[in-house]
Amino acid sequence: MSRVCELTGKGPMSGNNVSHANNKTRRRFLPNLNEVSLLSEKLGRSYQLRISAAALRSVDHRGGLDAFLAKAKDAELSDRALKIKRELAKA
């Protein structure tokens, strides 16, 4: 299971911990990923996706999974999310 959001493509970043004495040690910034079930109103079923907290807020802001996927770029979406987007286009 990779540490990448299935809807936005957000993944780990690298950087430094910086102490008060300005010592730098390498570290990773991991995305806040959660396993959530999102309901597709058009298809009438729910899908379990591993998405970031920011993506969950974006889905709510756009009015649900169907609206989010309609506007999302294909390059950012995972294979599973692309499959759902194609199913929505057919329906």
Swiss-Prot record:
Give a GO molecular function annotation for the protein.
structural constituent of ribosome
UniProt xrefs under InterPro entries: Ribosomal_bL28, Ribosomal_bL28/bL31-like_sf, Ribosomal_bL28_bact-type, Ribosomal_bL28_sf
Disulphide linkage map: none
Superkingdom of this entry's organism? Bacteria
List GO terms (cellular component aspect).
cytosolic large ribosomal subunit
Please provide the record's keywords in A-Z order. Ribonucleoprotein, Ribosomal protein
| Region Disordered, annotated ranges | 1-23
GO-annotated biological processes: translation
Pfam families referenced in this protein's UniProt entry, alphabetically: Ribosomal_L28
Q: Which family is this sequence assigned to?
A: Belongs to the bacterial ribosomal protein bL28 family.
Question: What name has this protein been given in UniProt?
Answer: Large ribosomal subunit protein bL28
Q: Which gene encodes it?
A: rpmB
